[in-house]
Regions:
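Extended alpha-helical surfaces
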Residues: 1-200
Length: 200
């Protein structure tokens, strides 16, 4: 998508906005992690020049920010402020939780952009691709948690983007509460995502 955006006409630039948002979120998360770790020099600002020119704020300004307060002030006019202002940075914060909130914002913007630029069957197909991608990421997370991390059901549920799920609620609950990876695969074998099992 980044390569397409490089050569896209101005009339289509909004459609590729989600690529920029993804880049900006990654940079913001990197900055938050470096501030929490108090390792200013661990922040890496390395993206293609043509992407840097299209960002919604001057990303170079992130380099010299040395506190959470300064970061919030710097991003106060951006779409990310409404998420970041709700976080208490005076205490150690959950990096995963912050990333989930920003990722939700990312998906919201993709949906809005698709609905703005496309109608009818094209819009339906694009949304279907997006929702399927999110569902597969959810399923992949559940499987990994069951296979490697043995997380609690509440922890697993909080890591998923269920607002975009089209799996029946009962099926999703059964996947989350599965006793292990084998049960997850068994449940998937009876769903529309049976192809996802591959050679597991």
């Amino acid at each position: 998508c980044a390569k397409l955006m490089k050569y896209s006409p101005k009339s289509d630039e909004d459609f590729y906005l989600f690529e920029i948002i993804g880049v900006e979120i990654n940079l913001i998360m990197d900055k938050l992690v470096s501030l929490q770790a108090k390792e200013q020099y661990s922040f890496n600002l390395s993206i293609p020049t043509y992407l840097a020119k299209k960002t919604s704020f001057n990303i170079d300004g992130l380099v010299n920010i040395e506190s959470f307060k300064d970061l919030l002030q710097y991003l106060s006019k951006t779409r990310y402020y409404k998420v970041l202002k709700e976080i208490d940075f005076s205490v150690p914060f959950d990096v995963k939780e912050v990333h989930m909130c920003l990722q939700s914002l990312y998906y919201e913007n993709i949906v809005e952009t698709i609905k703005k630029h496309f109608k009818g069957s094209v819009q339906k197909d694009l949304l279907n691709i997006l929702y399927t991608s999110i569902e597969l990421k959810n399923i992949s997370k559940i499987y990994r948690y069951k296979q490697y991390f043995h997380e609690s059901e509440d922890s697993i549920r909080s890591s998923l983007f269920l607002q975009y799920s089209r799996l029946p609620k009962d099926m999703m609950n059964r996947l989350i509460s599965a006793s292990g990876p084998k049960e997850v695969l068994s449940l998937l074998s009876t769903s529309k995502y049976n192809f996802y099992m591959d050679d597991k």
